[in-house]
Amino acid sequence: MSKIIAINAGSSSLKFQLFEMPSETVLTKGLVERIGLEDSIFTITVDGEKQKEITNIPDHAVAVNMLLKKLTENGIVKSLDEIGGIGHRVVHGGEKFADSVLITDEVLADIEELSDLAPLHNPANVVGIKAFQEVLPNVPAVAVFDTAFHQTMPESAFLYSLPYEYYEKFGIRKYGFHGTSHKYVTERAAELLGRPLESLSLLSCHLGNGASIAAVEGGKSIDTSMGFTPLAGVTMGTRSGNIDPALIPYIMEKTGQTVEEVVSVLNKKSGMLGLTGYSSDLRDIIAKEEEGDHRAKVALDVFVSRIHKYIGSYTARMKGVDAIIFTAGVGENSAIIRERVLEGLEYMGVYFDAKRNNVFGEEAFINFPHSPVKIIVIPTDEEVMIARDVLRLGNID
């Protein structure tokens, strides 16, 4: 049995989960927030109870030291020697990484080089990796990439209709994201269906504040809604999803904003927040719609219609689907959104059961037994996928 830590480092945060492997038992989990500020927050779960501490955590190295100290202080591990491996979520692996990989100096340099493709995320991921290297230099560490799962997409899916040299020189293409989540839920769907993954055509709907749809055929991603960046695809909490690119210079001309300012609006002030004017949270928006708010209704209609575009397109690409999967915050917990997405899809063999659909955050089939297309709610577990890859690649006993 080995203890493995799964790490997700943000620019001012560090999310962690400690597993006993291969049993996949969660020993503890927690979050360090507001790193670099005087009122940093350290939260850890010990024996089912959350412990919260507000203190000064100036950087990720201090956060890592504090985390490891808490593990020994609380008896979660007797000594740090029990930690057999560390798994780091890395947002962008470009074309270089089609699978998770053991971190070497060369790999770390490659991840840093890819930072121009994910300037908000990769630098923070690198900081997290280096912070653990300082404290646990001899423990195997593995990088698990959000983009890796989608590296099986064919050229017809990943190329943009731009001068081909842009792809050759600058790597401009669709990469796709949420890959670890899409991989987990499609593998789990095959288990629940009792069929080999290789025989299945699946639609994976990862619906959270960030959202993406993936077409997975034979266990391989053949297309996905996010693109060169996580800004593309369906309407999201604060992100616009796909728009006419000519809108960017038009908005600049009309508002006097710079390119960076317009892109910031598309990332942080658009989507459901932009359409409603008051919230990116679908729970708030659904409540407002029930009160008769027109913009809430329109925003929800837009959200669902954009998802339908991908369901229709990907069903055609795969010549039919065996199952539709709902995951992530909204997909797992919003029966209303699932119902609206599924309504009217009888033409493609989708028959959902409103009673069975009344589930929140748990695995469930929500289709009628006679439905040719199965509909499954599967809570995602990116952390366990990270831990599995550490076990697979780290030569851990």
UniProtKB/Swiss-Prot annotation:
Compartments, record wording: Cytoplasm
Keywords in alphabetical order: ATP-binding, Cytoplasm, Kinase, Magnesium, Metal-binding, Nucleotide-binding, Transferase
Cofactor notes: Mg(2+). Can also accept Mn(2+).
Pathways per UniProt: Metabolic intermediate biosynthesis; acetyl-CoA biosynthesis; acetyl-CoA from acetate: step 1/2
Reaction equation(s) it catalyzes: acetate + ATP = acetyl phosphate + ADP
GO BP annotations, alphabetical order: acetate metabolic process; acetyl-CoA biosynthetic process
Enzyme Commission code: 2.7.2.1
GO MF assignments: acetate kinase activity; ATP binding; magnesium ion binding
PANTHER family: ACETATE KINASE, ACETATE KINASE-RELATED
Biological function: Catalyzes the formation of acetyl phosphate from acetate and ATP. Can also catalyze the reverse reaction.
Assembly information from the UniProt record: Homodimer.
Homology family: Belongs to the acetokinase family.
Protein name as annotated: Acetate kinase
Organism whose genome encodes this protein: Bacillus thuringiensis subsp. konkukian (strain 97-27)
